[in-house]
């Protein structure tokens, strides 16, 4: 995207040289593959000595995400989730292990956040997305009706593989967790193919670092900074970072729309922050990013500590920042990045720690 | 990516009753060895003018090609003089960025001095058509930036073509681009059949001409009958055949937005993002704004400062229900005296008659949101065309004024099979779909909803074409906006 890259390029630079250390794995070359899936572009970069092996591993990982799109999509009418949304009101439905697991994890985040994270918010999301496209804002009566369809407690999990909805109009939308879940499954594929150095990017909103690039302690990711003043960064090594931010306001002042819905209010979230969160898995970082944006920094600190091995940074358009951590470091200006360039031993340490 | 498995060898394109809409493709050749024109399936070569160009020109003519020479403004007169005895078909002028403004005048003079030659202007701003990811490859590594989930970015040449159609009227835009390889694997492999095919499809869909750059190794491999090279090229030939020149001049671009501007400077990115969001628009030069040029237009996006006569034209346009969006245009205008005013952080919205004027006081710093706003400003019931579940596809709507049929050109920058939904303004009884891979024509089933026709495109890989026809004797509102505007814009905008 030329214009946005022009904005960030001056601020951000990541130089990963594969020549600064002498370990055998540094002979690895960089390979890249991407694919349009889930309405965005998934990208994988891999360091590996064999182009054929790297290409095969990346292709299998991307195909796994394609498969999961067929499970979790609510745009595809023939996806497993769409079928569940059409039928689970009537009787408990048997679902695949993937769908059961991602909904189970979603509900755990709903409980953890006291309902702020809620995958049943789909009907409201759809309606407000229509408002984003220029359709009228839903009147209070319609909004009230839609809110009655929402509620994670209306989803019943029946182990080991059945799900039932206790509302005739409930719809699940996995948009706030599905990409993170897909990233984790792709990571599993890469690991199974003996890939030790890789980065997976789900449309810019979730990254996972497998191992580290040759000669470095981790994968340096610059985090969203609406102020262009802070340049927060994180080094990923066997962990993930996700970013959430409300849809930008219309230049014409239509502030009433947005794709992140507050389930309590039934309306788009109003926030001045962009939020990035580091966690052990893509599923957790993806779900937490929406949750922490919804609850804000004050309540969010407790959640970050509760989850463990996580960190979050809220950055406002004015440059105000709030950081919470229960382990990982988020680097900001003045918080030096001495560990960016290291020898092969540090890279091995990253692997050994896990 | 290889598309060999997705293409159906041996399929012949059937003759179409409806007109072909096409772009002309020349191949840029730099190597002495070359296959015959008949084999390559391309009749015209573009040869960069250099010390060895005369020998190359002879070889090309011997192989049955019409030869065009690519020259700079400094070279053009001398080469044209030489050409009176050398017999090449024409000259392609490649002005540098600073020479663009004078190029049109230079071409005019050359056409008078050398009436036997064809002179073409080459647009130098072309870029490789592609769907891009987020990661940026630096010299020594990767740049990665987190963000909210991003839509796939599409690099298209549509804005370049639209500007050229406005600023160089009377000639078909001709552009070229250099292949961009972002990572080591791409650099090693070079472009594949799908990349060449996408370039051909894009130019054809835009009704523009293209000089296709072939890497030296492919040129040599084709010249020496390498089977792999010919397997690749035969896939491209299917696209060359699909987009061959026809009577595209008879087709009219369907637009609902006009962009009025003095130059690309200051407006390019906004226009580029409008193209990205499938907003069908045309560009008007300063002198082209008149009542006729605003006929059938819903939204005028003005980057030029209007003078007295143009202020009247804009006032009349909005009074009848149009929306005028003025960007970084300053002055005293009659609509500023209205009582119906709403102010936002970046804009002032005036309700005028049945329409509205929106003034942005500064330049557009967020063209993505601006383009989405333009899309939102379009009255829902008058949006000519919408796509669903296809963020990597551009659609270009044309209308055949002789038949009132609508023709939609589709380009999928993902280069992977895609199924998606289309909604077109108007009621169409018959929809036929053809592609370079499958030929002509698959009949699609329309569904008629509230004045729109909806249908599913079953499988778009790179390029495709839809023919939408009314039932016999029926001519209602079609994809063009030739209906009377409903005139509720002022009320809508001020109630936001």
Predicted features and spans:
Chain A
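Mature catalytic core of soluble alpha/beta enzymes
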Residues: 2-354
């Amino acid at each position: 995207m030329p214009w946005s890259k022009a904005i960030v390029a001056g601020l951000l630079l990541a130089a990963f040289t594969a020549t600064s250390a002498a370990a055998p794995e540094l002979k690895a070359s960089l390979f890249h593959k991407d694919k349009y899936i889930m309405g965005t572009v998934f990208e994988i970069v891999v360091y590996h000595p064999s182009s054929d092996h790297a290409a095969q591993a990346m292709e299998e990982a991307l195909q796994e995400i394609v498969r999961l799109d067929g499970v979790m999509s609510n745009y595809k009418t023939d996806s497993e989730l769409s079928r569940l949304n059409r039928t689970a009101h009537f009787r408990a439905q048997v679902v695949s292990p993937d769908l059961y697991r991602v909904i189970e994890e979603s509900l755990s985040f709903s409980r953890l956040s006291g309902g702020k994270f809620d995958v049943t918010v789909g009907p409201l999301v759809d309606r407000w997305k229509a408002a984003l496209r220029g359709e009228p804002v839903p009147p209070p009566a319609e909004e009230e009706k839609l809110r009655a369809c929402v509620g994670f407690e209306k989803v019943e999990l029946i182990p080991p593989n059945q799900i039932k909805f206790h509302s005739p109009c409930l719809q699940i939308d996995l948009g706030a967790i599905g990409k993170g879940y897909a990233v984790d499954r792709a990571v599993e594929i890469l690991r199974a193919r003996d890939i030790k150095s890789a980065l997976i990017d789900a449309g810019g909103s979730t990254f996972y670092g497998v191992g580290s690039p040759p000669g470095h302690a981790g994968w340096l990711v610059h985090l969203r900074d609406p102020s262009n003043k802070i340049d927060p960064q994180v080094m990923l090594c066997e962990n993930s970072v996700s970013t959430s931010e409300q849809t930008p306001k219309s230049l014409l002042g239509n502030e009433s729309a947005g794709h992140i819905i507050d389930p309590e209010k039934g309306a788009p979230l109003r926030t001045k922050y962009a939020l990035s969160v580091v966690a052990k898995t893509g599923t957790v970082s993806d779900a937490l990013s929406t949750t922490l944006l919804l609850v804000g920094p004050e309540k969010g600190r407790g959640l970050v500590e509760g989850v463990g091995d996580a960190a979050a940074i809220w950055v406002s358009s004015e440059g105000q920042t709030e950081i919470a951590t229960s382990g990982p470091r988020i680097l900001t200006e003045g918080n030096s990045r001495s560990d960016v360039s290291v020898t092969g031993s540090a890279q091995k340490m990253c692997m050994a720690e896990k | 990516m290889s598309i060999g498995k997705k293409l159906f060898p041996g399929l012949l394109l059937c003759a179409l009753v409806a007109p072909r809409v096409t772009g002309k493709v020349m191949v840029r050749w730099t190597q002495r060895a070359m296959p015959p024109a008949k084999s390559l399936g391309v009749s015209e070569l573009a040869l960069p003018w250099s010390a060895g160009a005369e020998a190359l020109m002879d070889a090309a003519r011997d192989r049955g090609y019409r030869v065009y020479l690519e020259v700079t403004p400094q070279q053009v007169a001398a080469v044209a003089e030489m050409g009176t005895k050398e017999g090449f078909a024409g000259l392609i002028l490649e002005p540098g960025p600073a020479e663009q403004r004078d190029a049109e005048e230079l071409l005019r003079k050359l056409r008078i001095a050398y009436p036997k030659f064809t002179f073409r202007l080459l647009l130098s701003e072309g870029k490789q058509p592609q769907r891009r990811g987020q990661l940026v490859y630096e010299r020594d590594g990767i740049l990665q930036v987190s963000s909210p989930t991003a839509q796939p970015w599409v690099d298209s040449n549509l804005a370049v073509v639209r500007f050229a159609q406005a600023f160089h009227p009377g000639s078909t835009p001709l552009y070229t681009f250099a292949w961009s390889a972002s990572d080591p694997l791409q650099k090693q492999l070079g472009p594949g059949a799908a990349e060449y095919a996408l370039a051909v499809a894009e130019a054809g869909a835009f009704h523009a001409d293209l000089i296709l750059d072939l890497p030296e190794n492919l040129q040599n491999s084709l010249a020496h009958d390498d089977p792999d090279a010919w397997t690749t090229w035969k896939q491209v030939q299917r696209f060359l055949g699909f987009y061959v020149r026809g009577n595209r001049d008879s087709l009219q671009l369907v637009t609902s937005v006009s962009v009025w501007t003095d130059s690309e400077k200051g407006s390019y990115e906004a226009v580029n993002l409008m193209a990205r969001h499938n907003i069908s628009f045309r560009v008007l030069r300063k002198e082209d704004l008149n009542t006729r040029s605003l006929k059938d237009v819903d939204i005028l996006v003005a980057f030029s400062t209007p003078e007295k006569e143009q202020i009247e034209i804009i006032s009349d346009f909005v009074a009848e229900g149009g929306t005028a969006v003025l960007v970084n245009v300053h002055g005293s205008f009659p609509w500023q005296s209205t009582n119906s005013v709403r102010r936002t952080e970046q804009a002032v919205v005036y309700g005028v008659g049945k329409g509205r004027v929106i003034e942005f006081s500064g330049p557009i710093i967020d063209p993505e949101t601006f383009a989405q706003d333009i899309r939102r400003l379009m009255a829902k019931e008058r949006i000519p065309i919408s796509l669903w579940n296809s963020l990597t596809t551009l659609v270009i709507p044309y209308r055949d004024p002789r038949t009132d049929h609508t023709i939609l050109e589709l380009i999928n920058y993902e280069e992977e099979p895609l199924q998606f939904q289309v909604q077109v303004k108007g009621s169409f009884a018959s929809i036929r779909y053809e592609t370079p891979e499958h030929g002509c024509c698959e009949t699609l089933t329309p569904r008629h909803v509230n004045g729109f026709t909806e249908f599913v495109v079953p499988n778009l890989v790179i390029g495709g074409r839809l023919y939408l026809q009314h039932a016999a004797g029926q001519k209602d509102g079609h994809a063009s906006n030739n209906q009377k505007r409903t005139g509720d814009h002022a009320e809508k905008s001020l109630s936001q």
